[in-house]
Amino acid sequence: KTMKSLVIWLGLSTFATIMTLPAYGQNSDIIGPSPYNYVTDSWMQTFAEEGMTFGGTSGVYVQNKGRIFFLQRGETRLPNPIPQSYAGFPASLGWNVLQGRGRVWQNVIYVANSEGEVLEIWNQWDHLFKGTNGPGPHRLRMSPYDPQNRLWLVDETNHIIYVFSNDGGRLEMTLGEKGIPGKDETHYRLPQDVAFLPNGMFLVGDGLGGNNRIVVRNADGSYHSEFGEGGDAVHQFASVHSLAMGPEQKLYALDRDKRDVKVFRQTAVLDSSDYPNYEYETTWTGLDLPLDITLGEDAAWVTDIRPPKIVKYNLDGTQDYVWNLPTEGPHMWIEMHSLSADEEGNLY
């Protein structure tokens, strides 16, 4: 069977590789056979001006192999002179760019293809993030039901969500009020993610700043309903860091601080008056500090840290395999914050 590629481009280490798992897996605690080919070769074309390098990359979304969207928390200004330890990404200098060291809010959104060639840089929107004091933009998503393929950007620090046209020419929707946190029908507090329903409605994971809720909104952005609460019970949240939809419209909500994934089943019929209605089903455990989840037809992938790793789950909640990422050397990782898959099953 031809092995898929695992194109890694996310995390505070901020570099891109394709990794050959069978060779690397001797030291990576793989459970079960891996279908991925993992080769430690540079992948992403660099485009930063002299004296600058990538920032902390927080989001990726693969529309197709010819159009892959990336979100970075600004770029990083390099010291002068550049230390010999510099290997093309800030973590090689021992920097955690999430803390903002050397950050310049520029080239936040860009588009590349599966060869790592940069196609577009959306610097016309950098002004939305200038002056941000904190992690800033957190996640990129796109609805599989949207014929316009609009790009959704969740800005955690500014409590706001932006929706752009696919070519970056228009800002088509804004949800929340920039810099104003809250817990009502129009405000969020550190929103983390969005997920999409077949009828155009969407869900907002509003759960890192104590709100501990998932907000349901109509296709036009108006408020519909919400569910979720904080607490120690298995169905309650400590945080809602990532959302993903799976088969049968099940919702998978990743709780970073409880270190688990909560699964909710859809109990209402599409287009009925009580749609959507989610009922807690089960919780997946066995994680250390999970950050993102993505679903396929028969499996789920979770990025986890402590140590940095990727975990594959079967949809019954059992772990299929786990592999750790290198934490030393030229391809080291501090964390992998997000991942996305293309039409051939390659993970980015």
Where are these regions (language model features)?
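Bacterial N-terminal signal peptides
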Residues: W9-T20
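Bacterial N-terminal signal peptides that target proteins for export
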Residues: K1-G11
